[in-house]
Amino acid sequence: MLKRFVNSIWEICQKDKFQRFTPVADAIDTFCYEPIHKSSSPPFIRDAVDVKRWMILVVVALFPATFSAIWNSGVQSLVYGSGNAQLMEAFLHISGFRSYLSFIFHDVGVFSVLWAGYKIFLPLLIISYSVGGACEVLFAVIRKHKIAEGLLVTGILYPLTLPPTIPYWMAALGIAFGVVVSKELFGGTGMNILNPALSGRAFLFFSFPAKMSGDVWVGSNPMKIKESLLAMNSTAGKSIIDGFSQSTCLHTLNSTPPSVKRVHVDAIASNILHMTHVPTQNVIQSQFSIWTESHPGLMLDKLTLEQLQSFVTSPLSEGGLGLLPTQFDSAYAITDVIYGIGKFSSGNLFWGNIVGSLGETSTFACLLGAIFLIVTGIASWRTMVSFGIGAFVTAWLFKIVSILIVGKHGAWAPARFFIPAYRQLFLGGLAFGLVFMATDPVSSPTMKLAKWIYGLFIGFMTILIRLINPAYPEGVMLAILLGNVFAPLLDYFAVRKYRRRRI
């Protein structure tokens, strides 16, 4: 029956007035069966894995990230949109798989989570494939060449890079830009310099920044989530400092001014976690002993929130730590990120129980995809490993250099430089970009040496943009696109080096 359907399409396209739609019939035939094209010149190689099946393997590798996107967006939407402060408290105090499963089964429900997630992700996926496919078909008909299989991967990668609240018309505009401008104008699949999915996201990021950053990470209706958070904070008596919010790790990092120093964060952490020793303990204790002369009977790890704020924001001459009062909430928030407190724990970051772009939240899901791509030989492990090494070493160097230059364990260096290097690998879209974006075979280098340099460069630029550039909370997208631009140059020098060695 399927073969009869395909043959009927071919018969229609053989008529004179429908011959221009031959690429459509060819694409349907190739998708349902196998390519009908034969090589016209040597070498003649028979291989069961054609481009279509190669693309399908990448889609299979994306299954864990896709399921994670559906599941996590559903959970976050139900919790943040509930208006129930007790439900939010229970969610934020989850510790371990047993408590997480208990919360899901008893408080929200599995089917409710899946349905809420599907309502968020499925429309974006349909828009991506529909609009992107229409652009592919249009150019194939105009140019009279076959429709390439590249959209199979781009169509699912693109919605995974978006926030769940993105308006549908913006999602359509972004995929159209990615397919047309970054791919078709360069000649189509295999000829593009930049990654189409990332190009579409970059277009939206610079054209509509308010819809791509800020409070856009939960549900599908930002206003509903905002009203729900206000109601929960009011019910629980939360302040702006310790209230519920949908801020991400990177948004918290990006909104922390350089005037928030490591000593401020350590002082807050020693009080929250009741730690008897933090890296800058000597500086804190020295100042605290002066401050307690006018506040007798207080202990550093047993201060109330008001007392802690008073100590941290008092002038240095009075025994305080000299932080501006208006920046205490930023220091309090970045403490959670640096020390992995509450919703920003390393477990939540690794497994994906956080807010963020749809496909970037779960590092574990990305690692499953990475293993599949490496085992099947689809993606380059060299690019992945070098990307991770570049990011880790750069983050570690920021910390070490700050300590060496400032002294006193970096007490008066910006706090943002002291996020543990391994946690940088879990933040934002680094894992997703490392596995699925940086390894794009078309826009990345082909030579082994070039792949190592390419990955190191992207990892370095990712952390540099995160920690230095206040305009962009995430550096992965810009770093990979910049790496795409330099990929041909890296290949050129790698080939020259190889030729010299051969001679």
UniProtKB/Swiss-Prot annotation:
Recorded topology in the membrane: Multi-pass membrane protein
Cofactor or coenzyme needed: FMN
Stored InterPro entries: NqrB, NqrB/RnfD
Reactions this protein catalyses: a ubiquinone + n Na(+)(in) + NADH + H(+) = a ubiquinol + n Na(+)(out) + NAD(+)
FMN phosphoryl threonine, modified sites: 248
GO terms classed as biological process: respiratory electron transport chain; sodium ion transport; transmembrane transport
Signal peptide range: none
One Pfam entry name: NQR2_RnfD_RnfE
E.C. no: 7.2.1.1
Molecular function, one GO term: FMN binding
Family matches, as HAMAP family: NqrB
Family, as annotated: Belongs to the NqrB/RnfD family.
Subunit structure: Composed of six subunits; NqrA, NqrB, NqrC, NqrD, NqrE and NqrF.
Functional note: NQR complex catalyzes the reduction of ubiquinone-1 to ubiquinol by two successive reactions, coupled with the transport of Na(+) ions from the cytoplasm to the periplasm. NqrA to NqrE are probably involved in the second step, the conversion of ubisemiquinone to ubiquinol.
Record-given protein name: Na(+)-translocating NADH-quinone reductase subunit B
Organism: Chlamydia felis (strain Fe/C-56)
The encoding gene: nqrB
